[in-house]
């Protein structure tokens, strides 16, 4: 028990000595008589202070397309040497490292030059790790809002290149030399984003040939958008609305809803166009891919409205207003239906058989009426005695007598025949007019089917052509980036 007390006492004494040692070391390093944090750590005015810089991306918070701002959470690693912050470890119980508040030592005041919100400094001034040889390691976290030029050409299958430029605010190259610690930014503690994929984070050191005092460190944040959200909520509804525009040509003209469907589709596309205008930045340099597709669809819908008006005009034509040209009959009634997989009604259909039967009945009724009228006329002028002896059919002309005088009631017979002929001609004319009207309706149906196939091919190839182009372009860009990362670069 006594031994345990002795060990505890020794441990407490050692901790006290260590605390006293660290306190003595801090007081020694920050002694105002030997250290001034406002003075650059150089022995003379021509000596350069080399600052090694590296960015570690912790989180890609957001990319605001309309304001063209990228918000990131980064850790800014900075390393340099200060000859004034050196000591001999043997004088301080072999203590080789100490942590000092960063605001109590000299800092290279590296800031984000392309800042977008006025917060150029880091978010938190963490402690700096000082080694006995004077090397300083400082890792402050920061949330930066940097300006980013958004390329909307392939939205939502776009890939952006947002840069972050770091430079000392007050020191130039004759006093501080910024050096890249690593060619790429670190992703060791990165939290994946739900909207963007990190393609590459290369860094480079920039110098100005015209200005020997200029130097900066620039990191390129090459990011690719995850298009699933916009595909589900924007592109697929647009494609479905386009399919409704195609179905306009499959809708029968007699239903009277062609124009209603066309206008409804056009209004729906206008609403989607307004949604896109609130997402993408108001730039006149490029039109987003979805905007191009919507404009393409709106042009098709507008054209479908024009063609629907023409189809309805053809559908409601009649022989009293229009005459069908021979080329229309040849093209739209004989040739195009076979090419468009339309089966034209045959001549022996039920309606044609009914029409022939009606014509046969009309001829039979006219013949019966004619025979009845002729029989009554002959019975009026026949001799009753002769009729009994010879009959009406045995009536013969007497020799020596002239021809019989004209029958007084022949005019009635002619009027009856003319009336029957007029009725037959009128019914035949109505039947012919109805046949021509049905031909016009069939021509309208052929035009509808023709534009249906045209719209199907245009929409399919237009959609595939528009949305495959950015995918191939992103693939080519990624291949070039991989080749560039595999090739060593010179600083």
Curated annotation (Swiss-Prot):
Reactions that this protein is recorded to catalyse: Ca(2+)(in) = Ca(2+)(out); K(+)(in) = K(+)(out); Na(+)(in) = Na(+)(out)
List the Cytoplasmic topological domains. Answer: 252-258, 315-449
Compartments in which it is found: Synaptic cell membrane; Cell membrane
Glycosylation positions in this chain: 44, 161
Q: What is the effect of changing residue 278 to E?
A: Increases channel conductance by almost 100%
- Site Key residue that may interfere with effective access of the conotoxin BuIA to the channel binding site — annotated at 77
GO molecular function terms attached to this record: acetylcholine binding; acetylcholine receptor activity; acetylcholine-gated monoatomic cation-selective channel activity
The entry's protein name is Neuronal acetylcholine receptor subunit beta-2
Q: Which InterPro entries match?
A: Neur_chan_lig-bd, Neur_chan_lig-bd_sf, Neur_channel, Neuro-gated_channel_TM_sf, Neuro_actylchol_rec, Neurotrans-gated_channel_TM, Neurotransmitter_ion_chnl_CS, Nicotinic_acetylcholine_rcpt
Q: Which residues lie on this side of the membrane: Extracellular?
A: 19-226, 278-292
Keywords, ordered alphabetically: Cell membrane, Disulfide bond, Glycoprotein, Ion channel, Ion transport, Ligand-gated ion channel, Membrane, Receptor, Signal, Synapse, Transmembrane, Transmembrane helix, Transport
Give the gene that encodes this protein: CHRNB2
Q: Which family does it belong to?
A: Belongs to the ligand-gated ion channel (TC 1.A.9) family. Acetylcholine receptor (TC 1.A.9.1) subfamily. Beta-2/CHRNB2 sub-subfamily.
Taxonomic source organism: Gallus gallus (Chicken)
- Which PANTHER family does this entry report, sorted A to Z? NEUROTRANSMITTER GATED ION CHANNEL (PTHR18945)
Its transmembrane ranges are: 227-251, 259-277, 293-314, 450-468
């Amino acid at each position: 028990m006594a031994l345990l007390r002795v060990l505890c006492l020794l441990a407490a004494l050692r901790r006290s000595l260590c605390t006293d040692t660290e306190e003595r070391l801090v007081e020694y390093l920050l002694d105002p008589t030997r250290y001034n944090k406002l003075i650059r750590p150089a022995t003379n005015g021509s000596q350069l202070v080399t600052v090694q810089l590296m960015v570690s991306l912790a989180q890609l918070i957001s990319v605001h397309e309309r304001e063209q701002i990228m918000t990131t959470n980064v850790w800014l690693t900075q390393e340099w040497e200060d000859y004034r912050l050196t000591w001999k470890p043997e004088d301080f119980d072999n203590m080789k490292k100490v942590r000092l508040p960063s605001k109590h030592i000299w800092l290279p005041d590296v800031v984000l030059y392309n800042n977008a919100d006025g917060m150029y400094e880091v978010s938190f001034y963490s402690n700096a790790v000082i080694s006995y040889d004077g090397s300083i390691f400082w890792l402050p976290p920061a949330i930066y809002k940097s300006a980013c030029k958004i390329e909307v050409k392939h939205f939502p299958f776009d890939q952006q290149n947002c840069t972050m430029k770091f430079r000392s605010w007050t020191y130039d190259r004759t006093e501080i030399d910024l050096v890249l610690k690593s060619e790429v930014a670190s992703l060791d503690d990165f939290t994946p984003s739900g909207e963007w994929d990190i393609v590459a984070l290369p860094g480079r050191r920039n110098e100005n040939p015209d200005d020997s005092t200029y130097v900066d460190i620039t990191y390129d944040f090459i990011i690719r958008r995850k298009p699933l959200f916009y595909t589900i909520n924007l592109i697929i509804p647009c494609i479905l609305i386009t399919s409704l525009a195609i179905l306009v040509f499959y809708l029968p003209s007699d239903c009277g809803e062609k124009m209603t469907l066309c206008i409804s589709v056009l209004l729906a596309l206008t609403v989607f166009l307004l949604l896109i205008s609130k997402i993408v930045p108001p730039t006149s340099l490029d039109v987003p891919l979805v905007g191009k597709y919507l404009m393409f669809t709106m042009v098709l819908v507008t054209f479908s409205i024009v063609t629907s008006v023409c189809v309805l005009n053809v559908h409601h034509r009649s022989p009293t207003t229009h005459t069908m040209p021979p080329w229309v009959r040849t093209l739209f009634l004989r040739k195009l239906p076979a090419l468009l997989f339309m089966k034209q009604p045959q001549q022996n259909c039920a309606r044609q058989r009914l029409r022939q039967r009606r014509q046969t009945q009309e001829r039979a009724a006219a013949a019966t009426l004619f025979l009845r009228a002729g029989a009554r006329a002959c019975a009026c002028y026949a001799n009753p005695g002769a009729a009994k002896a010879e009959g009406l059919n045995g009536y013969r002309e007497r020799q020596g007598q002239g021809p019989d005088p004209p029958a007084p009631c022949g005019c009635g017979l002619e009027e009856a025949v003319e009336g029957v002929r007029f009725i037959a001609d009128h019914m035949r004319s109505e039947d012919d007019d109805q046949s021509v009207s049905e031909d016009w309706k069939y021509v309208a149906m052929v035009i509808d089917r023709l534009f249906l196939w045209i719209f199907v091919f245009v929409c399919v190839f237009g959609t595939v052509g528009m949305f495959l182009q950015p995918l191939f372009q992103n693939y080519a860009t990624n291949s070039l980036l991989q080749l560039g990362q595999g090739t060593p670069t010179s600083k």
